[in-house]
């Protein structure tokens, strides 16, 4: 913090003056947080009926008609075939179920098998999903970035790509996207386990009887990026949350402790005393204490090597030749091709990154001879 009113949640961030920010302050909750519904931090309305969750994670109202329809779809005609089990769910079980939902088409079955000590067979399903990778079309291609591909002519496979910091930032930005935003970009068709069914379930549940509000429904279907997480050359349109302003307080005692609280209409009413002044959050990607968005994750100017499996490393002549040696690819078999990456290619890269280990080859479709020529 300094006289220009900035703060950061990250260590070693630099102020406008060029010095590292080193004054510590305690972050407090907003004073009007008590006005929120206590104990109701979820998305569903309290007192709603029970829900029915199928093995492929379709969430439905717990109605008899839905239950009978599910049994009919599963070709279960005799109720004597069914038995009930009670399961205790803790943090470990939740992590297992999350992983199963991303990799398996039957995550509840896999989850129960794992609980019973069975081996993990989900990698087979992941490979099957990668084989069915299709292409996603974008609505516009307003921006493009160049990418040089190094291709094995005999294998019709991308060995690696040579890129600038813009393409590296694009790939790294995939790690910042909320899962709901990824599914929205892909039209709810990610092929990723059963999360498409979860996404569709939220779409189908009404705010009249089940979800608390349209705002919360939209939060699930189209969540925003955290403040300052968007890149300057963003090809995919995921909205970024705005960063709130904060208010600085001092306890006025000899030890002079500082406190920070989100700025609200009631922030000046505090047991800490009157607020000393507003503060704005620093963009952690800025080296000069800027509070506006933008910027990237990697330093430039720089060149990067991106493998077919999306491993990003610093490019050098030695590293590229060594990589070709590891792949046992003769230099005479290597061809170069410059391609353009726009919104459509970025969407397909995002999808391939989720389900394929040959993302560059899959996206740039080397069966198209125009790429190989």
Predicted regions and their residues:
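Long, position-biased, composition-driven segments near the start of the mature protein
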Residues: 1-373
């Amino acid at each position: 913090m300094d006289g220009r009113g900035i703060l950061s949640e990250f260590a070693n961030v630099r102020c406008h003056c060029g010095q590292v920010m080193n004054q510590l302050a305690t972050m407090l909750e907003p004073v009007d947080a008590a006005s929120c519904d206590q104990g109701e931090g979820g998305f569903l309305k309290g007192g709603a009926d029970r829900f029915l969750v199928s093995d492929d994670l379709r969430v439905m109202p717990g109605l008899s008609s839905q239950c009978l329809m599910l049994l009919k779809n599963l070709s279960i005609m005799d109720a004597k075939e069914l038995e009930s089990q009670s399961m205790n769910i803790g943090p470990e079980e939740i992590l297992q179920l999350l992983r199963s939902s991303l990799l398996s088409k039957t995550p509840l079955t896999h989850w129960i098998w794992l609980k019973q000590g069975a081996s993990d067979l989900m990698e087979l399903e992941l490979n099957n999903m990668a084989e069915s990778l299709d292409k996603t079309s974008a609505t516009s291609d307003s921006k493009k970035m160049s990418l040089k591909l190094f291709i094995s002519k005999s294998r019709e496979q991308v060995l690696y790509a040579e890129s600038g910091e813009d393409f590296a930032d694009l790939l790294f930005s995939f790690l910042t996207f909320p899962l709901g935003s990824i599914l929205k970009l892909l039209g709810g068709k990610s092929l990723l386990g059963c999360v498409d069914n979860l996404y569709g379930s939220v779409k189908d549940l009404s705010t009249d009887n089940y979800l608390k509000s349209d705002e919360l429904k939209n939060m699930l279907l189209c969540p925003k990026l955290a403040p300052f997480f968007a890149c300057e050359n963003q090809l995919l349109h995921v909205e970024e949350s705005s960063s709130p302003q904060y208010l600085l307080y001092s306890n006025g005692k000899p030890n002079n402790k500082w406190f920070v609280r989100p700025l609200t209409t009631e922030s000046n009413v505090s047991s800490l005393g009157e607020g000393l002044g507003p503060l704005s959050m620093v963009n952690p990607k800025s080296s000069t204490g800027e509070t506006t968005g933008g910027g990237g994750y990697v330093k430039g100017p720089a060149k990067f090597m991106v493998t077919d499996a999306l491993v990003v490393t610093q490019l050098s002549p030695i590293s590229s030749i060594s990589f070709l040696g590891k792949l046992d690819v003769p230099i005479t078999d290597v061809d170069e091709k410059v391609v353009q990456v726009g919104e459509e290619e970025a969407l397909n890269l995002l999808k391939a990154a989720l389900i394929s280990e040959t993302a560059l080859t899959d996206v740039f479709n080397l069966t198209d001879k125009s790429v190989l020529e």
